[in-house]
A protein has these predicted regions:
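Short alpha-helical elements
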Residues: 1-282
Length: 282
């Protein structure tokens, strides 16, 4: 059974394959020209997606067609090349062209997940008895499409990560002049106000002392997106130690979320061969 529906995997793979550098199937430096052939990228990518969705170790998802060592080497190669970040940016561009990003109202929030193996970005989690964990800072548009993500240790506060998170919006072009950022009470402070003022953004920040349900406003979309991201086992319990690998899976999951949002919105606006007839993708 595939890890993701075919209607979601195929467009992601075609976009990802276009970003891959060309490499010979057989090592040209081998004296006899009979070196073991390189495992096709599509086969490895399918195993990587399975690891992302299920959160399993590479030994558990390895098969006769692709070993766990091949998966590790290819993930390291793709992560160091920044292919997941490029894929996420490409999916955002397609979403903006077909549906349109709602950048007038942004929402940002942080989320803490487990990192039992530690790693370069892991830190002591204040909500998990000091065990190793990761924090994911995410900014979305008004409909919950993830625009940029920043990973850090679980012991990092949300407010200092807001600057790097918003800095990642530069590839989207200039924001609307009346753009606002919706934040929870963790961001209430002078540094956050100064940051938003420097960026020319208005801040809609929940105030301390007032009941939370009355101040949800337009911030709930980012919390829903965090829940979508936590549906990927590799993000919910990250076992990667390298910073590049952590960000690779983070942006790969974001690309899947953006593509799913695109298909669901485009289903009622466009027609194409194999168009899903229901909201449930197959």
């Amino acid at each position: 059974m595939p890890a993701v529906p075919g209607s979601l995997f195929e467009p992601i793979w075609h976009q990802f394959a276009a970003l891959l550098p060309e490499r010979p199937e057989v090592a040209p430096g081998h004296p006899l020209g009979c070196h073991r052939r390189r495992v096709p990228d599509r086969v490895v990518f399918a195993h990587v997606v399975a690891a992302l969705v299920h959160g399993s170790g590479y030994e558990r998802i390895a098969s006769a067609d692709c070993s766990d060592r091949t998966i590790r080497r290819r993930v390291r190669e793709w992560a160091e090349a920044g292919l997941a970040e490029a894929l996420h940016a490409l999916t955002l561009k397609q979403y903006d062209r077909m549906i349109g990003l709602e950048l007038a109202d942004l929402a940002a929030d942080g989320c803490i997940t487990k990192a039992p193996c530690g790693g370069a970005k892991a830190g002591r989690s204040p909500v998990d008895r000091g065990k190793q964990g990761l924090k994911r800072s995410t900014v979305t548009d008004a409909s919950g499409v993830p625009l940029h993500l920043v990973s850090a240790g679980a012991n990092r506060h949300d407010a200092p990560l807001l600057g790097p998170t918003l800095d990642g919006l530069g590839h989207l072009g200039p924001l609307p002049p009346d753009a606002a950022v919706h934040l929870d009470r963790a961001y209430g402070g002078a540094p956050t106000g100064a940051l938003l003022s420097d960026l020319g953004l208005a801040g809609v920040i929940a105030r301390k002392g007032l009941p939370a349900p009355l101040q949800v406003g337009q911030r709930w979309v980012v919390e829903r997106t965090q829940a979508w991201m936590n549906g990927f086992g590799k993000l919910r319990r990250c076992t990667e130690k390298r910073s590049a690998a952590v960000d690779f899976y983070l942006f790969l999951a974001a690309a899947f979320v953006v593509t799913r949002c695109l298909i669901r919105e485009a289903r009622t606006r466009y027609r194409w061969p194999g168009r899903p007839t229901t909201r449930r993708l197959k």
